[in-house]
Amino acid sequence: MNLSDVPLRPGSAELLPVRGVRALQAFDNRDWVAVEVPVALEFNGIAHAVMLATPTDLADFALGFALSEGILLGRNELYGVEEAYAPEGITLKLDVASAAFARLKARRRSMAGRTGCGLCGTESLAHVTRALPPLPEGPALSTRAVARGMRELASMQVLQKVTGAVHAAAWCSAEGEALLVREDVGRHNALDKLVGALARSSVPASTGFIAVTSRASFEMVQKTVAARVPLLAAVSASTSLATAIAEDAGLTLAGFVRGDDLVIYTHPWRLNGLPANA
């Protein structure tokens, strides 16, 4: 699947005047710049978080954020999302079930984040790494499928190709076909959008894997586990905390996925096609 010929989404980029220099010669030009705006999330009228995000796929973002943060236990706990636009930014007003609102109040957070900040304003260390049930075994996957998924993700990054400023996350089938892709200036936001899109779709999340264009930080691992996806493939490295969480949760974590090369940090048994040790 290749979406490189798809035009830019409305509101995702702006064409701005720039001053360029090439071979020591200055020139005037116009260039596409990714849009970044404050996006506030309200739950039943109570302000909860402000993220800096690309203003596309906002319904997916709202649902995915609430699911990956453990505020919602399922899509059925979200009754609706209203998008309110103002000069200073966008407010996503989520109407959630009373049980979900009670969970939110029990682990009160008030975040004002940098781009995609996943921890800003966390009031307790206990809220940083929350316990999640171990992942199911899931399907047998192959290193070839992981490599294919990362290639397809790269080919489908429409906004990144034009602006060079955004991350992307994709859900890929067991064969490596990238079936859902979301982009955002923040890596956490891109993954939240993907989690929301997965929840809205009929795709069984545990039958494939997630590929991301960033490092595998612990938040990315935690969000993948919360989405019940058994493998996370990242183009860059993992961290010590991300690796520990992946190990405990039964997540296969792969980093430095570039071409046919990759590094497997945890649970390599889930991947077929690994060469024998020399």
UniProtKB/Swiss-Prot annotation:
- GO cellular component term, pick one: cytoplasm
Q: Which GO terms describe its molecular function?
A: sulfur carrier activity; sulfurtransferase activity
Compartment(s): Cytoplasm
Q: Which keywords, in A-to-Z order, does the entry hold?
A: Cytoplasm, Molybdenum cofactor biosynthesis
Which processes are annotated in GO (biological process)?
A: Mo-molybdopterin cofactor biosynthetic process
Q: Which residues form the active site?
A: C117
Function text: Required for formate dehydrogenase (FDH) activity. Acts as a sulfur carrier protein that transfers sulfur from IscS to the molybdenum cofactor prior to its insertion into FDH.
Q: NCBIfam families from the xrefs?
A: fdhD_narQ
Q: To which protein family does this belong?
A: Belongs to the FdhD family.
Q: What is this protein called?
A: Sulfur carrier protein FdhD
As recorded in Swiss-Prot or TrEMBL, the protein's gene is named fdhD
